Amino acid sequence: MKLTRLFACAVLPFMFGCNTAPEFNTFTEADDPVAVTEKSLLAWNQVGRLNGIWASADSLYSRSEVPVTPGQKLCRIEGWKGERVSAQFLLYTGTGAEGVVCKVSDFASADSRMSSDIASARFVRYTLGDQASPTCRCDRSPYSPAILAPDLIDTLKVFNMDARTTRPVWVTVNIPQDAEPGVYKSEITVSAKGCGKVRMPLEVEVIDQVLPTHED
């Protein structure tokens, strides 16, 4: 079922006007079938408004738990010219965050530059699934517990985060085939209404090798 949300624009005194946040369509995610423990609730009580940490792109993270991964302040990925490389960071909030937006800056090395258009930072959505079992190759048993797992990479440009939730953000960088080799620095700025800004430094090392196109 689709849900339409409209961010309200607060009218502040002594202002000439205000910008209305865009309307967007999205779906309502399922409730987490796994009950939140008292320990988790206590951990959320220590979390402020909006936080961000880099995390492994090879791991899945619960929507209902405070991230326990040893978060990194800087993410560095590498790839050939023409290669698509990815990374993941986690946003989490104890109080909720309205109108979360991620903006990628240009990539700059010592003597070259790549446009921010080569990159995207997209919100990961959660869906219900079966708990993974390496021995299960059949339909789900009625006794098999369901889990809420990160699954869909959405195209939404703006997102509302509920209180006490974690939201993965999937970062993709398409390295141009004509890129100059070197280490490029960028930054993803995450902003939300009343939450300030969260800055996620990102470095991409372009290796002096060319990945052939599918035509080749």
Task: Annotate each language-model stretch with its function.
Residues 89, 182-193:
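A short beta-strand micro-motif common to beta-rich folds, especially ectodomain repeats
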Residues 197-216:
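An acidic-aromatic substrate-binding cleft motif
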Residues 79-84, 162-166, 181:
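Solvent-exposed, conformationally flexible loop/turn segments
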Residues 15-17:
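C-terminal motif of bacterial Sec signal peptides marking the signal peptidase cleavage site
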Residues 2-9:
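Sec-dependent signal peptide recognition
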Residues 94, 174-181:
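Short, surface-exposed loop/turn segments at beta-strand-coil junctions that are enriched for proline
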Residues 22-71, 94-171:
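Surface-exposed binding patches on compact interaction domains or structured appendages
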Residues 86-92, 172-174:
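Short edge beta-strand/loop segments characteristic of extracellular beta-sandwich folds
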